[in-house]
Curated annotation (Swiss-Prot):
EC assignment: 1.15.1.1
Name of the featured protein: Superoxide dismutase [Cu-Zn]
Record keyword Zinc present: yes
Primary role: Destroys radicals which are normally produced within the cells and which are toxic to biological systems.
Record note on temperature dependence: Highly thermostable.
Reported regulation of activity: Inactivated by diethyldithiocarbamate. Inhibited by cyanide.
Oligomeric and partner information: Monomer.
A single MF term (Gene Ontology): superoxide dismutase activity
Catalytic activity as recorded in UniProt: 2 superoxide + 2 H(+) = H2O2 + O2
Cited InterPro entries: SOD-like_Cu/Zn_dom_sf, SOD_Cu/Zn_/chaperone, SOD_Cu/Zn_BS, SOD_Cu_Zn_dom
Amino acid sequence: MKRFSLAILALVVATGAQAASEKVEMNLVTSQGVGQSIGSVTITETDKGLEFSPDLKALPPGEHGFHIHAKGSCQPATKDGKASAAESAGGHLDPQNTGKHEGPEGAGHLGDLPALVVNNDGKATDAVIAPRLKSLDEIKDKALMVHVGGDNMSDQPKPLGGGGERYACGVIK
């Protein structure tokens, strides 16, 4: 009986030790709406911060801006009088209202993530860590966004890292 109890205890401890994670389905976005799936990003709680593990395809090669946006929607909305892809996601997650884009380790937007790197085959599989984000609860019901082009993690010379249009989006549930 003692061995059985120890086995049950070990199973409970091992099961409880699993890190919380969430798989986010990612879709292409345009000013007309949400398009085809390009894969997923699994977000896992780690002792170093939230880890974002992409399994994405059909992306332009190179670096891309990668952010958490304030609202959990990938639908288009009107900005400056014209329809804009995934505009309903709002801006970068910034609960402290810093108004600054300083990258994942800076004191600005909490939604600033390390750049997403896409290989020459259009695939992104390299995980990145967001050290300031510790819990999935912080980003629940927000949007995960891939922007066209790189991100210099600054508001200079262009705002929001100089990244381009919103290219792919998924809602973190």
